[in-house]
Amino acid sequence: MMNMQSMMKQAQKLQKQMQVSQEEIANTTFVGKSAQDLVTVEFSGDRTLKSLNINPDVIDPEDPETLQDMVTDAVNDALSQIEKVTEQKLGKFTKGLPF
């Protein structure tokens, strides 16, 4: 059975590893794309929108809904990537915890 000092050291080690993983995620750029890459967005891992690029060919004043859908798709694509990487990197730290 581990003593208290050993458990504290292990907890500190896990905390440091988790912090490093969080920093890696925050420093990663995630690119989301709509169909045919007509709209692209870049997010940092902390979910800050860094850029939004729209192909001029899809800008149609008569049909703003299509552009809105493409922007939504690109944003959701990037956020989904962030969520997936976050789960991969940080999920190992929370598995088995009672919350």
Curated annotation (Swiss-Prot):
The keyword Ion transport does not apply. Its main location: cytoplasm. Disulfide bonds: none annotated. Keywords: Cytoplasm, DNA-binding. InterPro entries: YbaB-like_sf, YbaB/EbfC. Binds to DNA and alters its conformation. May be involved in regulation of gene expression, nucleoid organization and DNA protection. This is Nucleoid-associated protein llmg_0128.
